[in-house]
């Protein structure tokens, strides 16, 4: 009975660690850069999107702000002009896998490696950018993700402020308030191009 309880508890801990990217349990992950001083990093996941990405870029340009876009490879190939605009306007790009598949964390490390490299090469071909920034789908990490990150010489990027901007019925004001309450030196803010309409007041 005791052994079974220990096994169950250990399994729960491992599962919990997989979904808590800030713990860095499986792979060293940048979630905050205190050395950056009184600045924060804006990051946008799941793009590019033909409707939302131009609006996000317009807003950033108006405010003179730079951000990092973690792009999905298949979407990048469908909307190469948006990838080129992101790069041309001085924003950083990162890899958010080829399709953002729900089953990505369950793949073999070699399949993950191929996925990351495919996305990296696509971004290079489209916009001439060579990125080693990587954010795993849903922020899930495990030993397979760790091996793929190492093989591809990627730098895993997490977040220290989760906006929850994709939740239904979440207003722009609620999202902004949540972010404002959690601001701090060098924090990394997670936002979304797809499903994150609250940020732009849609």
Which residues are covered by each model-predicted region?
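Hydrophobic, well-structured mid-protein blocks that either form specific transmembrane helices
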Residues: 98, 102-148
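Acidic-and-aromatic substrate-binding clefts and catalytic sites of carbohydrate-active enzymes
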Residues: 47-51, 71-79, 102-110, 135-143, ...
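His/Asp/Glu-enriched short active-site or ligand-binding loop at hydrolase and phosphoryl-transfer sites
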Residues: 140, 146-182
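Catalytic grooves of carbohydrate-active enzymes
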Residues: 179-202
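Hydrophobic core of alpha-helical transmembrane segments in multi-pass integral membrane proteins
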Residues: 4-17
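Charged helix-capping and loop-helix junction motifs
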Residues: 84, 109-116, 171-176
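Active-site beta->alpha N-cap acidic-glycine motif
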Residues: 18-104, 118, 122, 151
């Amino acid at each position: 009975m005791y052994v079974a309880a220990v096994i169950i508890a250990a399994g729960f801990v491992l599962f919990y660690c997989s979904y808590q990217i800030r713990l860095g349990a499986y792979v060293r992950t940048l979630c905050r850069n205190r050395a950056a001083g009184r600045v924060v990093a804006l990051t946008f996941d799941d793009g590019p999107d033909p409707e939302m990405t131009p609006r996000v870029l317009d807003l950033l340009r108006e405010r003179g702000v730079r951000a990092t876009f973690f792009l999905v490879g298949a979407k990048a190939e469908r909307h190469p002009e948006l990838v080129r605009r992101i790069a041309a306007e001085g924003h950083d790009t990162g890899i958010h896998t080829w399709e953002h598949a729900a089953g990505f964390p369950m793949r073999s490390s070699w399949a993950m490696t191929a996925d990351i490299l495919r996305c990296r090469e696509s971004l290079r071909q489209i916009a001439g950018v060579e990125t080693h920034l990587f954010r795993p789908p849903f922020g899930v990490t495990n030993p397979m993700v760790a091996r793929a990150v190492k093989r591809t010489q990627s730098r895993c990027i997490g977040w220290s402020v989760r906006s929850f901007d994709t939740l239904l019925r979440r207003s722009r004001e609620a999202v902004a308030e949540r972010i404002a309450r959690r601001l701090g030196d060098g924090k990394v803010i997670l936002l979304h191009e797809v499903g994150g309409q609250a940020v732009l007041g849609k």
